[in-house]
C-alpha cells in the first residue's frame, strides 16, 4: 500500500514523480534516498516526510555521547544524527547505527552534488 509522503520544504514534487521515486528509493533504516528526494522518518514511521534534493543545501553527521550509565556512569554510548539543511532551516534526525548513516552520506556524495560535511 502506497502512502504519499509529506513535503517538508517549500519545493514539492508532483505525484507522478514522487510515487515511483519513493517506491524504488534505497533504504537506510527509517530513511531513503531516491533520484529526486531524500525521505525522512517522522513520528516513528519510515519515510513519511521528504525533501527534494534540489532544496537541500548541505548534509552532515553529528555525533553525541550519552550520559554515563552502568557502574556509576563509567560506560558511555554514542548517538549519531543526520543533519539536513534546507530552506534556511536545519534539523537533526537520529540514526540507530552509525554505519547506516555513513552509507547514506556516501551515497549522497556519489549520486548528488550536495555538499556533505560541515563548511
Feature-to-residue mapping (PLM):
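Anionic N-terminal interaction surfaces
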Residues: 1-35
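Acidic, Ser/Thr- and proline-rich intrinsically disordered linker/docking segments
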Residues: 2-3, 58-119
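A near-ubiquitous, low-amplitude feature marking generic local secondary-structure context
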Residues: 16-17, 21, 39, 87, ...
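A generic alpha-helix propensity feature with a strong bias for hydrophobic helices
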Residues: 17-18, 55, 118
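Short, surface-exposed coil-to-beta transition loops
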Residues: 28, 46, 77-79
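His/acidic/aromatic-lined binding-pocket segments of jelly-roll/cupin-type domains
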Residues: 30-31, 49-50, 82
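Phosphoinositide-binding peripheral membrane targeting modules
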Residues: 34-72
